């Protein structure tokens, strides 16, 4: 029998895999395998309906500790439901099991370079390394521990199958790594902090590229609102929204609404890269020896990483504000000349004017955003989903927009002070600017430009989300 031959010749490359090889690797007869698959189907079909729908699959996966947030249930239904009737009967379930076990056997054989019927840590590490995935020794040990149920230091095909059988995604080493990250390693429900696991992965550059393009498109689309917001923030009179729009149009026509957008877009990539790098450096410091930093640790690490990134790119932000608030009868100034004038006339410290209120607002914003996001998600589960499933992407997007708007509102006075300090060439301190605004304009002075800021939230978040998802598909990150 070919299956036996391939098993008995460790150094020989196996022939094309078949279900016969799968049965031999599992030490299982066709009858026993049929009974096992039938029992698994009945486990999901606990209502004895004879078919599986999205709710049954969701409940079954949840009972197996597979978080609903990763939409495995809908993906599983989509893969199994060959006739597209919205349910999975036993024959469809059976066909999925045949295809999945054969697929898992093929990649198991590819990783098992010794062809001795098991995967050792060195073989798993080599497979991950070839796929461009760099993981630490402790992460590799954790990977082995989660799959190796009998803790004998190797992974058999049965253990491999049990770990991956219900993962509906294609069995590539990259997808298997993602599955382990999601199910066993991390829980990335937070929106205001950097998720664990991303920076250790070789595809981080692709994720940063996708996020960078999404940010660039989003910022360009909402640039007129940003220009209007900044123009209103630096005003000390009640000029109003419409007169300000007319003033911008009168000075530079349509291009006036996009003044400073080039710098705003240019900030995206370096800011994201620095934030990820700083987060990775801070994680072991905050988490200690075990590396588990928890939600509060991630919030702190994310906030500090954001502060590092903000400090690094802050001169670009200040020059952007100067460009947007520059008033001249000869038109828009040249970027290089404006930067040179700041350096010569005000000195290098001027490029960090307003940094203090900017940094003060980072962690409060992230904390309010996170708390509001989780609260809104819980409310949506309780009132709309009746605790049956995790909110889908549209609900999560809505929760994110609302929580982001709330967080921004709470720290908005700091943003106004920062913008005014950036635009002002005099050496006014944060305290002096605060008192000047309070005495001259009252509390409403701290909220100038907040309405354009609100109106930015929905289009900005929606465009970012749609472009990011499209880029993930194009870059094969799903």
Swiss-Prot record:
Ca(2+) 2 binds at residues 148, 150, 152, 159. This is Calcium-dependent mitochondrial ATP-magnesium/phosphate carrier protein 1. It is found in: Mitochondrion inner membrane. Counter-exchange transport activity is saturable and inhibited by pyridoxal-5'-phosphate, EDTA and EGTA. Activated by calcium Ca(2+) and manganese Mn(2+) ions, and slightly by iron Fe(2+) and zinc Zn(2+) ions. Repressed by copper ions Cu(2+) and slightly by magnesium Mg(2+) ions. Magnesium Mg(2+) ions promotes slightly ATP uptake, ATP-Mg(2+) being exchanged with ATP(4-). It is a multi-pass membrane protein. Residues 1-207, 280-302, 374-396, 469-478 are mitochondrial intermembrane. SMART domains: EFh. Induction: By stress conditions. Belongs to the mitochondrial carrier (TC 2.A.29) family. The gene is APC1.
């Amino acid at each position: 029998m070919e299956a036996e031959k391939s098993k008995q010749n460790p150094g020989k490359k196996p022939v094309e895999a078949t279900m016969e090889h799968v049965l031999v690797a599992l030490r299982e007869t066709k009858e026993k395998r049929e009974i096992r698959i039938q029992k698994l189907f009945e486990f999901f079909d606990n209502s004895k309906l004879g078919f599986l729908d999205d709710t049954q699959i969701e409940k079954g996966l949840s009972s197996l500790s597979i978080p609903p947030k990763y939409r495995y249930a809908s993906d599983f239904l989509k893969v199994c439901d060959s006739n597209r009737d919205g349910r999975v009967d036993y024959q469809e379930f059976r066909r999925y099991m045949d295809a999945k076990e054969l697929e898992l056997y093929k990649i198991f054989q590819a990783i098992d370079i010794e062809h001795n019927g098991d995967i050792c840590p060195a073989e798993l590490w080599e497979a991950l390394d070839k796929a461009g995935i760099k993981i630490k020794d402790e992460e590799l040990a954790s990977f082995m521990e989660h799959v190796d149920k009998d803790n004998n230091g190797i992974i058999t095909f049965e253990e491999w199958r049990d770990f991956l059988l219900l993962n509906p995604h294609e069995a590539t080493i990259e997808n298997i790594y993602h599955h382990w990250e999601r199910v066993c390693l991390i829980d990335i429900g937070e929106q205001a902090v950097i998720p664990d696991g991303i920076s250790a992965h070789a595809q981080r550059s692709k994720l940063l590229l996708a996020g960078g393009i999404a940010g660039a498109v989003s910022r360009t689309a909402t640039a007129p609102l940003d220009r209007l917001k900044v123009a209103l923030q630096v005003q000390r009179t009640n000029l109003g929204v419409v007169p300000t729009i007319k003033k911008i149009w009168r000075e530079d026509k349509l291009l006036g609404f996009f003044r400073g957008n080039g710098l705003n877009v240019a900030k995206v990539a370096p800011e994201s890269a620095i934030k990820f790098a700083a987060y990775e450096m801070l994680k072991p410091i905050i988490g200690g020896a075990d590396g588990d930093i928890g939600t509060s640790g991630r919030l702190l690490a994310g906030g500090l990483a954001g502060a590092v990134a903000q400090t690094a790119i802050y001169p670009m932000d200040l020059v952007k504000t100067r460009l947007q608030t520059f008033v001249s009868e000869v038109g828009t100034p040249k970027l290089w000349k404006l930067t040179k004038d700041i350096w010569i006339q005000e000195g290098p410290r001027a490029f960090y004017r307003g940094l203090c209120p900017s940094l003060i607002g980072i962690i409060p914003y992230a904390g309010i955003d996170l708390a509001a996001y989780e609260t809104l998600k819980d409310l949506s589960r309780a009132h709309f989903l009746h605790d049956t499933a995790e909110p889908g992407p549209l609900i999560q997007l809505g929760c994110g927009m609302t929580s982001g708007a709330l967080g921004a509102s709470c720290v908005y006075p700091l943003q106004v002070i920062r913008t005014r300090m950036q635009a002002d060439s005099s050496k006014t301190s944060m305290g002096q600017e605060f008192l000047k605004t309070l005495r001259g304009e009252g509390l409403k002075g701290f909220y100038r430009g907040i309405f354009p800021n609100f109106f930015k939230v929905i289009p900005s978040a929606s465009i970012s989300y749609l472009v990011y998802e499209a880029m993930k598909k194009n870059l094969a990150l799903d």
